Each structure stands twice: as structure tokens, then as C-alpha cells.
Amino acid sequence: MNIILNGASGCGKGSMAGFLVRDFGLVHISTGDLFREQIAKQTPLGKKVESYVSTGKWVPDEVTIEVLLDRIKQPDCAKGVVLDGFPRTLNQAKALDKVLNIDLVIAIDVTDEIVQTRLGGRYMCRQCGTIHAARWDKIDKCKKCGGELYQRDDDKAEFIQKRLENFKKNNGEILDFYRDANKLFVVHDKLENTPADTYALVKDVVAKL
């Protein structure tokens, strides 16, 4: 079973992926996590990625696909994956279609206001990379490993609007691509919803596959 989680940054893709891993045994693959891993290691590819993300720009398709395909080929992905943050362009969707059968695309639809609120209150652990939402997690240290929490540069106000604009510019044709393939399911999220509220809708659809 291979699933794509689609939606703007801050819509809750990471939380939904965590639930799907727990309940269906899928491997969570986040392009953002893969990028940060490459950057942390300061590999040649990581330095290339860093030059884009540090200024709020999109990482080019060919670089993103190279990183992702290398991960999908690993043995632990044989039972199925949940892709978080990929594809982000129609070219990426078409390239993915050639190498991996996608069973379902779940698009989490949120307003700009929700994105601004959630990203503005999102913090990451410096030690293990776990993301915490200040609205739900009333803590000052990582609840997974006890590490220090910090706000990523691209979660700060000056970058959020640019990320939204980039997302909207490409996402319509991606949704059309999967809608035409009868693989698209849209979840309309609300600001007052907890991650568990949203996941109840997602789980019901996935369980029917």
C-alpha cells in the first residue's frame, strides 16, 4: 500500500503519517526530513539542497527525485510507504508514477489562516528532529528525547507566505493528475480540529483499500 499525503506546510501531514505508520505498518518518507539529513551530513547533495531551502525556494525536481528514489529502493519500503511532501510538481508526480504504484492520494485542505497559525507555533527538536505543535504540546523540551526545541527559519512569518505561494502555484495540476486517475480523496480540515479529529477521516478511507 502506497499513499501520498498532499497539503500545504502546516496542514498536519506529518501527524497523519505518524498515525498511518502506527496503524498500517507503512514507512514514513518525508522529503523535508531527507533534505535535512543530507544538509546535516553536508554531503555535496546536501549543500545543494541547503542553498535553496535556506532562502525559502523550491528544491529543483531533478534533485528532489534523486534523493527520494534512493530512499524508496531501500528494503524497508517493500511493504508500503506514506509519502509526505512529495510530489510537489506535476513533473515529480509523473516521474513517481513510472517507478511506484500509488494507491491513494489524501489531500488535506486548509485555509491560509490555519497554515499561518500552525506554522507560527511549530517547533522542532534539535536532537531527533521531532516536530511539536505549541497549540497541543505544552512543553519546553522534546517529549521524545528531551532535546532542545527551536523554530526553523522557514517556519517564521517572513517565509510562510512565500511557501504558501509556491505551494499553490503547483498544487492544482497535481490534484488534477490524481483526480483523473481516481486516486484522490480530499479532507477539509478546520482550525479547531486536533490531529486525532482529522485522522479519523483519513483512517476510514485508508481502511477500505
Each model region followed by its residue ranges:
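ATP-dependent small-molecule kinase phosphotransfer cores
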Residues: 27-101, 152
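Hydrophobic positions on the alpha1 helix immediately C-terminal to the Walker A/P-loop
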Residues: 16
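Hydrophobic anchor at the beta1->P-loop junction of P-loop NTPases
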Residues: 3-5
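P-loop (Walker A) phosphate-binding loop of NTP-binding proteins
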Residues: 8
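NTP-dependent small-molecule kinase module
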Residues: 19, 148-209
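Cys/His-rich short segments
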Residues: 116-161
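ATP-dependent NMP and nucleoside kinases share a basic, alpha-helical "lid"
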Residues: 73, 86-135
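Conserved lysine of the Walker
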Residues: 13
